[in-house]
Amino acid sequence: MLLASVPQLDRVAIQLGPFPVYWYGIIIGTGVLLGLWLATREGERLGIPKDTFVDLVLIAVPIAILFARMYYVIFEWEYYAQNPSQIINIRQGGLAIHGGLIGAVITGVLFAKRRGVSFWKLADIAAPSILLGQAIGRWGNFMNQEAHGDEVTRQFLEGLHLPDFIINQMYIEGVYYHPTFLYESLWNFAGVILLLALRKVNLRRGELFFTYLIWYSVGRFFVEGLRTDSLMLGPLRIAQVMSIGLVVISIIFIIVRRKMGQADKRYLEN
C-alpha cells in the first residue's frame, strides 16, 4: 500500500502568511484552558480567589514548558549537541511530561509560599486539571505522529474498533504503529473521573495529588513499555524509572505525613 493512498491529517492547522500554526500547540493550549477552568471553578467553591489559578497558570505553564524541553534535550543530548539550533524548536513536539511536572511542582511550591496558601490545597485542586491537560495533550502527539508504539498491522488496529482517522494517522512511512497516545489518553481521562469522584470522599489534604501521581505513573509505566521513542539512560526507559519513583515517593509521603500529623486537615477544609 502506498503512503499516498492513506488519507492523513495535516499537522498544520492554519497558515498565517509565512507562519504555520500547528495542531500540537492548539491542542496543548486547549488542555491548559480547560484545566484552568476546572481548577478555577473548584477553587472558588473552596474559598480560593478566582485569580489565584489564573496567576499560577501564567507563571507555571511557561516554566513547565521550559523544564519539559530541558528534560527532553538532556536525554537526547547526542542529537542536540550536533544540532543546537533545534533546541528551541518545540513546534513539532519534544516536550517531556515528567520534566514539565517537575517545573510545575517547583513553581507551585514557591507560588503558594508567596501567596500564603497551602501548597497541598492548591495541588489537590489542580490534580484533576493537570491530568485532564495530559489526556488532551496526547492528541497533540497523535497529530504529530509521535509517541507511538511498535509496529502492528492494519487488521490489528481495525480489531480495536478504532475510527479510520486514528488508524490512518498511525500509518507512518509505510508502517502501522500502536496508538500508545490513545492508550495513555484514555487512561488519563479515566483518572480524571476517579479524581473528581474522590473529591467527595474528602481525603486528607495532599492525598488527592498523590493519588494523581500514582494513577498517572502506573498507566505511564505500562504504556511506555510499548513505545519506540522512549528517552533512555543506558538500558533503562527514563519514564518507567520516573514512574516507579513517583509511586514509591507518593506512598512514602502519604504514610509519613499521616504519622507526623501533617495530614490532619481534609480536602474540603478551609
UniProtKB/Swiss-Prot annotation:
It is an enzyme of class 2 (transferase). The keyword Amino-acid biosynthesis does not apply. This is Phosphatidylglycerol--prolipoprotein diacylglyceryl transferase. InterPro entries: Lgt. One of its GO terms (cellular component) is plasma membrane. Belongs to the Lgt family. It is found in: Cell membrane. Its main location: membrane. It is a multi-pass membrane protein. The gene is lgt.
